[in-house]
Amino acid sequence: PYAYEALSPNISGDTLHFHHDKHFQTYVDNLNTALADCPECQSKPLDELLKNLDRLPDPKRTAIRNNGGGVYNHLLYFDGMCACHSSRPSGGLAMAMERDFGSFEGWKEQMKAAALGQFGSGYAWLVSETSGKLSVMKLPNQDCPLSMGLWPVLCLDVWEHAYYLDYQNRRAEYVDRWFERVNWPFAQERYEGCRQ
């Protein structure tokens, strides 16, 4: 949704290029391969597949979980950032953060703790229940909150390929810089979508 250099200096054009055109594209290609001989899966939207992994044919379940999660999670990650420097959420999302985390800063602390506490690869998530209650969680690999009945509002990719070219092993610095690029209008739209 933006040029490779648009998130610089927070995330470099090189990182974004490799992340999007190499890593993300591999998930897209592998998901398409997994779906190629599964006609009953092809007619369903990706979010429905991830919500209903237990209903997928056994031979396809793991490939769709891993690669479908890789596609969905990356799309949310990329769309959840913007070229403009972000400030804070507004509207219903801001009120929900105040209610559920005590403050915007309380949310940031929990999100950062989840991102830094994720051992190895995975994501930190801001998720909502259908009631609108927000929480923060971390999940390994390409697991997706949809599979747990939760609605993803934002995600922060903490796989090393998301930051290593720019920050090497300084994940905390990457997390701090990610906060500066959060696409709050997108997050607000996602939050409103949890009740539909």
Show where each model-derived region lies.
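Feature for soluble, non-membrane regions of globular proteins
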Residues: 1-196
